[in-house]
Structures are given as structure tokens and as C-alpha cells.
Amino acid sequence: MGKLHSKHAAICKARESPEGDSFVVNACLARKGLDDWMVKQKYYCSSSRVDQRDCQQKNNCELSPRDPLDEGYAEGISDEHYRLEVALPPEKTDSCSVEERMQGTEGSATVGPHKQLQFEELECAVSVEEDNRQEWTFTLYDFDNNGKVTREDITSLLHTIYEVVDASVNHSPSSSKTLRVKLSVAPDSSQRWKNCTQTNTDTPNPKHKGEKCIEDSKTSEKKSRAFLRRYHAEHHSQQGCQRHCVDENLERRNHYLDLAGIENYTSRFGTAAPATEPAKPTHATRSSNQSRSRSQEPENGQVHPAHHRRSQTMSTDPPAILTRHTHALRSPKTHRTPPTQASAGRVMRRGAPPPPSVPNQTPPHQSSGPYRRHKQRPKEALHYRALGPSVTSGPVLEKEHVRDLPSLVLYEGGLAQVVQRHEHHHHHEHHHHYHHFYQS
């Protein structure tokens, strides 16, 4: 039936390597020892029969493609056994000593019973550099000998590994092969020790030149420490930057809130401002200026036609009066005044100005003629019907203050307009009533 259609071909697949023909073996290390594992690998690669017990070992062998016209095809497989690349997955064991892994090998230098070299993981890799040279790399992870590892321990361990490898490799009588055994020991995470040594010795075997060395794990530790140092430095710098940014944002937000005047907005406009309150600096936002100018549109519409008939003079009132005046303009009650209320307010201001101490229960137009009383009654009815019970003495007193002031300064878009309310209303109602007097 042939090798390509047998059970062996099911787990052995052809592979082309750019370096040439090679044989790749992935195997799990048995606890019986390295010798049993090497015997099994040699049996898999030299035989075509694989039973069910061997399939459970999860060994994958890949045969490189060869010329089918080659007469020595079976001999080529035995020759290819020298070209091995073994990648062992790490196997975690519970305190497995080197004696248990290395027992049963002929001529092996056993470690003394008082020496219990323990390691958690073992990794073995074999690479083929040339036709007559192989390199075997063993890595022991979490290697610990109670924190005391001597040169003799490492040397005996390396000799044991080399004898196991030498016994597992087929020797060709016609050619010599160089085996390089490399041992890497990674220290235990709980212990920091650096007693790893490196040895390079040749074996007395005339057919093989053994090169033995030990890799120190200082480079890996330096890399890990540098990585941790860099991580901590970046972490601390990021924390400092974030803290600085948060403080800067809070200061900027408080500064903008102070500029907008939002902190004391409700306490400032909830009740009438006292006369002793200092004047607020004129750094209000432009949107608030526009909203205040829109609230005065019914009065500003009558201000502009008569504004060119009088000179523009700057107000020289005391600070207390200006403060009360600006608060009367900024009051939310004034913002919500409907047009009927504004017109009624103008009607109430048409009469003679009463003294400031007189309350506003008495209508100010009683001293006028009968035609004024007749025309102002429906407007007063509409005014009191629109206001209802919400009319209090607060806005009325504020309007009295506004009427008594000789001039008013409004800021809109950076341009100052001097509006003389009292003089304007005097001219306007004189012209208006003069016209009505002649019509009637």
C-alpha cells in the first residue's frame, strides 16, 4: 500500500523548507527520562508501523519530499535522522528532580541524593546548522536548588544531558558529527541569584566533538528590569500630566464662571439690591447685553426718533444710584414684562411725577384732564387684568427709580448710547397730547 497511504502518512505530512530537507519533530517529554523520549523518536522516524498507543503521544513527524526514483529511499530516511529540529512544549511538573528525568541512561553521571535540583519547565530545541553539525538547546525554567547552585551541579547536569543526547543519536561509521549542547537556566522568580557558569569541554569520543556551554540569564533579567523601569516611568509621568491637566482645567473653568458672573446669579437677582452694594464691573458677556437690549425694545423703539433732537451727555450719578439702576434693568421680572405691561407702565408715567415716598396705589394721572382719564381707563383695566395677583411693589419701586433718573447708559456691541428717559418721555407725551388736544 505504500507509505503515503498508511497510518504513518496520516500524521507525517510533507513539508518543503527553504533551508533544504529537514525533519521536524514536536514531542512531549515523558517523565521516564530523556532516553525513552529519544528512543520513541528514533522508532517513529525509522519505522513505518505506528500502533494506537504511540498515536496518543501526539507526536507529529513531517517527512521532506524526496525523489521517488531514488533507490535508497529507506536509507535516506535513516540518513535524515541526523537532521532533527525538536521543539518541546513546556511541561509543568511538581518539583521534578533531574534524577527522575535522567535515570536509566548508561554511563550517566548521576547527581548526588542530597542534591535536589528542581525546575518547573523544560524546553528542548535541536537545530541543524550543517550536515555534520547539530545544536541541542535545553532551557530550564524556575530552576532552584534552595538558592545555592555550585559549578559542580551545573557541570554534572550538563554532562548528564550530553550523555543522553549522545546515546540517542545514531552514529555513522563513515562520517563524524559535531554535537553542540547548550543549557540555559532561568532562575526562580522568588530568588535572585546569578551563579550560572559557562563551560566548553570536548568529549573523549573520537567520533564526536562535544561543545558544552551555559547561557547566563543576565540579559533576560536586564531586559525585564528595563521594561519594568520604563513602564513605571511612563506611568508616573502620565499620572503627573493628568493631575496637572485637571488642575489647569478647573482653574480655567472657575475663571470663565467668574467672567460670566454665574456664581451669584440667583442671590443677586432674587430680591431688590440694597443701596450699599458695590457696582459690578462691566465685563458681562455680549449675549447678556443682547438679551437686555431686546427686553427694552418697546421703549427703545420710541427713543431713537427723538434721540437726534437733544445732546448726548454722560451720566454723573453716584455709584449707589447706578447700582440700583443696573439691577433694575437686569431683573428677571423686567425681562418677562409683556408688551401690554410695558405700555401700561408708559401710561402710568405720563402724569405728574409723584414724590418717591408716595406708594403707587393712587394712579398718577388724576391731576390730568377728563379726556386723559377717559382714554387711560381701558388701558389700566388691561394692565391689571394681565398682571393679576403677581403685581408686587418690587418692580413698581424699580420703575420709579428708573423714571427719576435723568439719564441711562446702555452698552451694546461696545457703543455707548446716552438715553435720557425723563426728558424723552416729557417731549413725547407733550407732542402726543398736544396732537390729541387739537383733534378733540
Swiss-Prot record:
Keyword annotations: Calcium, Cell membrane, Cytoplasm, Lipoprotein, Membrane, Metal-binding, Myristate, Wnt signaling pathway
Per the record, its GO cellular-component terms are: cytoplasm; plasma membrane
Domain EF-hand residues, every copy: 129-164
Q: Where is the composition biased (Polar residues)?
A: 192-204
Among SUPFAM superfamilies, the record links this protein to:
EF-hand
Q: Where in the cell?
A: Cell membrane; Cytoplasm
Molecular function (Gene Ontology), one example: calcium ion binding
Say yes or no: keyword Nucleotide-binding present: no
Composition skew (Low complexity), residue ranges = 272-293
Give the GO biological process terms. embryonic heart tube left/right pattern formation; eye photoreceptor cell differentiation; heart jogging; Kupffer's vesicle development; left/right pattern formation; negative regulation of canonical Wnt signaling pathway; negative regulation of protein import into nucleus; negative regulation of Wnt signaling pathway
Q: Where does Ca(2+) bind?
A: 142, 144, 146, 148, 153
Q: Where is the composition biased (Basic residues)?
A: 324-336, 422-440
Question: PANTHER family from the xrefs?
Answer: PROTEIN NAKED CUTICLE, PROTEIN NAKED CUTICLE HOMOLOG 1
Please give the function described in this protein's UniProt entry: Cell autonomous antagonist of the canonical Wnt signaling pathway. May activate a second Wnt signaling pathway that controls planar cell polarity.
Give the protein name, as stated in the record: Protein naked cuticle homolog 1
Species of origin reads Danio rerio (Zebrafish)
